[in-house]
A protein has these predicted regions:
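Substrate-binding/catalytic cleft of secreted carbohydrate-active enzymes
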Residues: 1-94, 113-116
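Beta-rich accessory regions
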Residues: 106, 110, 116-119
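Acidic, His- and aromatic-enriched active-site or binding-groove loops in soluble protein domains
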Residues: 93-107
Length: 119
């Protein structure tokens, strides 16, 4: 089931745990909007808010679940599409919507924790 609005709870076990679709924070970047309505799983009002929410999602929701066996992630979604503006890149693929350094830092923190736990 999709889990956009509920706490993430990975239970330790003998199987691989994957978060196969998460994120979906909408923000229509000015000058790069798709031609139709805008949709996402929660809406940010600015690039700064989008970046902050991405960091918080990674730090407070995903990172703590690594110790329980979370092993794979798929962020929704890579780029905006006609009816959804919840991508990391704009509809025209011309701009990364959140701050690149902040995204890199959040992702590197996940990678470092995963490496620490799986050594």
């Amino acid at each position: 089931r999709h889990n956009y609005f509920y706490p993430l709870r990975v239970r330790p076990g003998k199987r691989v745990a994957a978060l196969s679709e998460y994120g979906g924070i909408a923000w229509p970047m000015p000058g790069h909007e798709p031609p139709r309505r805008t949709y996402g799983y929660g809406t940010a009002k600015s690039r700064a808010e989008l970046t902050e929410r991405y960091q918080k999602l990674q730090r407070d929701t995903v990172l703590p679940q690594l110790k329980n066996g979370l092993s794979a992630l798929v962020y929704t979604q890579v780029s905006d599409v006609e009816d959804e503006v919840n991508g990391l890149f704009t509809y025209d693929r011309a701009a990364l919507k959140p701050d690149p350094a902040a995204v890199r830092a959040a992702n590197e923190a996940l990678e470092a924790e995963f490496e620490r736990l799986t050594r």
